[in-house]
Amino acid sequence: MSSDTRQTSGGNARSKRRLTDAVDEDGRPTATAEDPTSNPKRQRVSRACDSCRSKKDKCDGAQPICSTCASLSRPCTYRANPKKRGLPTGYIRTLELLWGLVFNKIQGSEEVVRTLLRAANIPSHLATMGKESEGSDTLLSSWKNSIVLKEIERLLTFLEQPEGDQERSARGEIDSPADAEESSVLSPETLEWQLPDSIAVASQSPLASGPSPVRLPRPSTTRLVRDSGTQTIPLGEIEDLTTNGSSHDRPVIASNSAREEHRLPPNPWPLLDIYFSYTQCWFPILEKHDILRTAFRQGDDDQYNSPSAAGDNAALWAVLALASIQQTSISTTRQLSDLPEDRPDPDQLYAKARSLIPTESGTYQLGHIQALLILSLIKLGQQDCAAAWMLVGQAVRSAQSLGLNDPSDATGVEKTAGRSKHVFLGCFVLETLVAAKLGLLPSLRKTDLTKVGLINEDGLEEWHPWEDQTGLRPIESSRSFQRGPLHALSTFNRLLSLMCILNELCCVRQTPANSMSYLGTLERQLQLWVSALPTSYRIDLQTVSTKPASPHIFGLEMMYEAVATAISLQLAVQKNERNGLRRASEGSKRLVSLLQAYMETYSLSATCPTFGIALTLGLPLPCMKKTAPWAFEASHGINHKLQSFSAHLATVWIHNTGSQRRPRHATQQGTHPRSPMAISLPGNNMRLTNLIEESRTGNLSTTDSYLSPTWMRTSNDENAVLSLPTPASSLNIASGVETNPTSQQITHQHRSSVVGKPNSALIMSDLTTPFPASGHHYQQTYDDASLHFNSLADIESTSSAQRPRIAPDLDALFDELASLDGTDR
């Protein structure tokens, strides 16, 4: 038999393929398998033989010998396992059969798997497919390292073997005693998956934290299966795992009752409106869209259980707790009975927010620090300063552990968040306030702020107008608000600069040596601060009824008066001058006037939780009883009344689940109630009387609408400095050394800093410049006579000392103030 050998053309002239034409006995050619006329359509075989695959020849897949190998007289085998794309053949069906076997043989397995599937946040794991982060998926790596996957791969390899090899392997598997023992336990009565007893009573699928024990017929082989797939724990260690085990070591399951606890209260949006209207405007530590996103995702179990959302959830519940207290106080102070009965319980919201904050060994996120600060505001409103001190201290340490106090530290992951700087600065503000109230030394100093810097003032919260969509304002209020810029961010920067002065006052109290010179320095710093304040950040009591100011502007003015009063008191104690207490008394009266204007504009329920501290910041501290006992005797009346007023403000923040009771003011001078929760006031006919009898005299009236202490007035030599225009955005905070300068040292100098000789006893840092010397971002303040800054930059040689205008009849004033909550006069 003859044959023609044809070679394909190529650059190397090598034979690629050899085709043989066969002829029959009559010499006529017969068509081969490669003849296009005999097989016009090309057929694809499922598997080629080993020889054709290695030589890249066409193979018809015939077994035991393909036609190509037969024509070329070469061995033909089908032993090699071909590499295919995608999943191995039978992989999906094997998984289906496996789960069917589990559901059929193990009681309760279907219910347990369903609850695990709901709690596992599967969409977040699917989102990592094809990404670099896929390799770090713990659930995926647990499956790939499990013995179950290895067993499935062994079964699939077995199916791909030739029939003869399959028969031999099958006989070997049957003869295996270990497998025979395992197959003997697969009866419907031997295996059972059960949920923990604490949630087994639930009628539907539970989602409570805790593992699922697997009961085997013999106690010695009982194991608790964990989600790693490769580790088992004896059943006796279940209790230790459920109490001490990490959430990463066991499935997260929660019961229906636990899911109800995670559900937001009915209609939480009014609570969010209250917070963002009256708290966010002066304490902008939150991103509004973060809170809204977290609130909308509360219905999604996967998003709620995500570890990355733990901090945001804690912050959200803290916001709801604070706002719910203010909302509840509306019904308490106004005796309203038509409020919905299903309104949230502030105590439960507070407990929920507190439970979401990790312990000392947990992992903290930025949202956890935000929650701690908001909860400390509640304690400040309740005037439980000891609890607020602990909460703020925990927030400060957590912020430092995340590296928020060191921008140069690149290891702080949380610092990439948009509000990390705001949160750290918020820690500084609250810690300084509580330390000043308790007479303690704050851990954060101005030097810590110089590393972080002030916040950027260009944002939506700076230029968006203030809006009130809540029910805190009286319904009959018809005052129209000017739709001007909110200036929340720049106001927060100015509050920070003011808190730097108060922060140093706390340190001066702890170092009596040479404190007089440093108190003079603080006077000068406060004078520069208020002189640089534009009129849009001041409160005009003459026009506030027709042109109301925003809540945070009221708060800034009240805090300034509180700091000025505290400095006046400290100066009087250091100089041992009884007459010096008159300045502190005047500051207290100005605070009361501001508070009256605020409550007339808004309401008692809308008061800030720091107002109580502002009222009592100028009261003598208990530590002054030894050095200046006359301070308590000389100001006994005003101390008693300010404490009464402060206790009245605390009624907003105290919620009693039983009878609504109001805290009774402290009856002893110089003492501050630790927690107003334990004291009460009788009834709704309480009257706040006049502060002191001598306040009724008419010598306190003045035409000046802006309030300012008399010692804040400038001299002739200082007027040249204070008449300079106010440049750019906000107050800079920088470290420096300053003493009380003389007028000759500052004449004709720019009001950027006042530098003198350093004192070796105590180095005080200064506000180097109220405004940097770049561009005029804000309006000029001191060259325009229409801005009514006569009381702030008056020339003592040409005008007499003036006092702020106070209502001549303070009895009527406080009766009116007490009746703002809806009680009978």
UniProtKB/Swiss-Prot annotation:
Residues 49-76 bind DNA. One of its GO terms (molecular function) is DNA-binding transcription factor activity. Residues 1-12, 658-672 have a biased composition (Polar residues). InterPro entries: Metabolic/Drug-Res_Regulator, Transcription_factor_dom_fun, Zn2-C6_fun-type_DNA-bd_sf, Zn2Cys6_DnaBD. Disulfide bonds: none annotated. The keyword Metal-binding applies. Keywords: Activator, DNA-binding, Metal-binding, Nucleus, Quinate metabolism, Transcription, Transcription regulation, Zinc. It comes from the Eukaryota. PANTHER family: QUINIC ACID UTILIZATION ACTIVATOR. This is Quinic acid utilization activator. It comes from Emericella nidulans (strain FGSC A4 / ATCC 38163 / CBS 112.46 / NRRL 194 / M139) (Aspergillus nidulans). The gene is qutA.
